[in-house]
A protein has these predicted regions:
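Active-site-flanking beta-strand signature of metal-NTP-handling nucleotidyl enzymes
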Residues: 16-23
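Short amphipathic alpha-helical segments
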Residues: 29-54
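An amphipathic, aromatic/His-enriched active-site/gating alpha helix that lines ligand/cofactor pockets
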Residues: 53, 73-114
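Short beta-strand
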Residues: 58-63
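Eukaryote-biased recognition of C-terminal alpha-helical segments
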Residues: 114-122
Length: 127
């Protein structure tokens, strides 16, 4: 982890959203949650839907029970419209219910209800 992560370039300016979510404090649950997001087990309809609404990249980071999601999109991306559309796409609510078993949330919550948008309060470069 101390070697860092390569950042993909998209050939266009992008904007970034950062959200946080709390997971249930149970080692077995955390392992199952991570497995659900593995290349082998991640539902293809969910990946397709995420890309279909205009998301260029989505990354998940975890420490303990705290999960951070970084989403990169084109500059003209409208978060509220995209999330409303995503919620209607095939298997999306089924996925939310499935992963909700591992998350500290209410049953039936949508992705937008579970994740809290974070505020950027510092950046090093002025650009």
């Amino acid at each position: 982890m101390t070697e860092g992560y390569i950042v993909k370039r998209f050939g266009q300016p992008v904007k970034r959203y950062v959200q946080i979510l709390e997971l249930k404090d149970d080692p077995e649950s955390l392992a199952s949650y991570r497995k659900a997001h593995s290349r082998e087990d991640f539902w293809p309809e969910i990946k397709q839907g995420i890309q279909e609404v205009g998301i260029l990249e989505m990354e998940l980071y975890i420490i303990g029970t705290r999960e951070v999601m970084i989403v990169e999109t084109p500059l003209d991306f409208d978060w509220d419209k995209a999330m409303a559309r995503l919620a209607q796409l095939p298997r999306q609510q089924e996925w939310e219910n499935f992963v909700g078993r591992f998350q500290k949330c209410k049953e039936g919550d949508t992705s937008d209800e579970k994740w809290q948008m974070m505020e950027r309060f510092f950046y090093l470069c002025e650009d």
